[in-house]
From Swiss-Prot:
Transmembrane segments: 4-24
Pfam families documented for this protein: ATP-synt_8
MF terms in GO: proton transmembrane transporter activity
This protein's name: ATP synthase protein 8
Keyword presence, Transcription regulation: no
Membrane topology category: Single-pass membrane protein
Keyword Transport among record annotations: yes
Keywords (A to Z) from UniProt: ATP synthesis, CF(0), Hydrogen ion transport, Ion transport, Membrane, Mitochondrion, Transmembrane, Transmembrane helix, Transport
Gene designation per UniProt: mt:ATPase8
Any one cellular-component term (Gene Ontology): mitochondrial membrane
Function: Mitochondrial membrane ATP synthase (F(1)F(0) ATP synthase or Complex V) produces ATP from ADP in the presence of a proton gradient across the membrane which is generated by electron transport complexes of the respiratory chain. F-type ATPases consist of two structural domains, F(1) - containing the extramembraneous catalytic core and F(0) - containing the membrane proton channel, linked together by a central stalk and a peripheral stalk. During catalysis, ATP synthesis in the catalytic domain of F(1) is coupled via a rotary mechanism of the central stalk subunits to proton translocation.
InterPro entries on file: ATP8_metazoa
Annotated localization: Mitochondrion membrane
Length: 53
């Protein structure tokens, strides 16, 4: 049974590492959080607290 040369293991590790980094970065940048609706923003601005000292 033939054995793999060390350079082949290094190349395999580099390929899997690049694939893992690309997969993680694509998942990170493809996430789009839900932005608050304009109605909610208006309610937040209207209900602001006025401090009376």
């Amino acid at each position: 049974m033939p054995q793999m040369a060390p350079i082949s293991w290094l190349l395999l590790f580099i390929i899997f590492s690049i694939t893992f980094i690309l997969f993680c970065s694509i998942n990170y940048y493809s996430y789009t959080p839900n932005s608050p609706k304009s109605n909610e923003l208006k309610n937040i601005n209207l209900n602001s607290m006025n401090w009376k000292w």
